Amino acid sequence: MAITASMVKELREMTGAGMMDCKKALNETNGDMDAAVEFLRKNGQAKAEKKASRIAAEGVARAAISADGKTACVIEVNSETDFVAKNETFTSFVEAVNAAALASDLQGGKDGEDIEALLAVPFEGATVKDALVEKTATIGEKLSIRRFEKVAGDVAVSYIHGGGRIGVIVAANGASDDAAREALTNIAMQVAAMNPTYISRNDISAEELAKLQEITVDAALNDPASLPKPILNKLIDKAMNSSAWSDEDLSLIHISEPTRLALI
């Protein structure tokens, strides 16, 4: 059977595979469109296996919020190059996979059982793993899901920084109005910028607090214009015992564990 340009174009639109791959698939299957799709799928699996040993060091983070606004999910999917990480086909795929993760009952983690479970989640008539294999073949680079996380509360927000280099999700219990969302969004931005280890001072052990104070004072003493050490210690004690939250803030929300994914 003669393979026409329109057939190749149709198969390419159906699968996203390259023109030459589509032409080869149609030739191998004597123009049978369904068989050609299956051929490309199997060929994609073979290509993905060949790329399995490559290093996927680039990538992007994407986040999503559930329809009721109470659950947030953030995911990191890696590619081999920054060029692909910025590709709209790739980023749209990441967003779709994150939506599947959000809709599932999985909680997330890094390189753990939930990653394997996510790969088995139904996705566009197949599974996430099948889609990952197909995208690897279509895009031409190794793609891998590195991690995803969820948080839930009475209200949840997300923040993506640097075009997807950093993704943050934060949930809280309490009010769920616009003021609460604005406060949480500001917190998410601070988490993205500062990467805090603790939510509040009460979460820090006395030993760790003393160590942090010592490091801060010693660093300040390197400045010739610095105040004497006893005065610095008193100033830091005062700062540590103060509250960055007003009574109104504290009554508004109780922050759950924030999650920050940063591509390294």
Predicted features and spans:
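ATP-hydrolysis module of ASCE/P-loop NTPase motor domains
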Residues: I264
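N-terminal assembly/interaction segments in proteins that build large macromolecular machines
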Residues: A2-L252, S256, R260
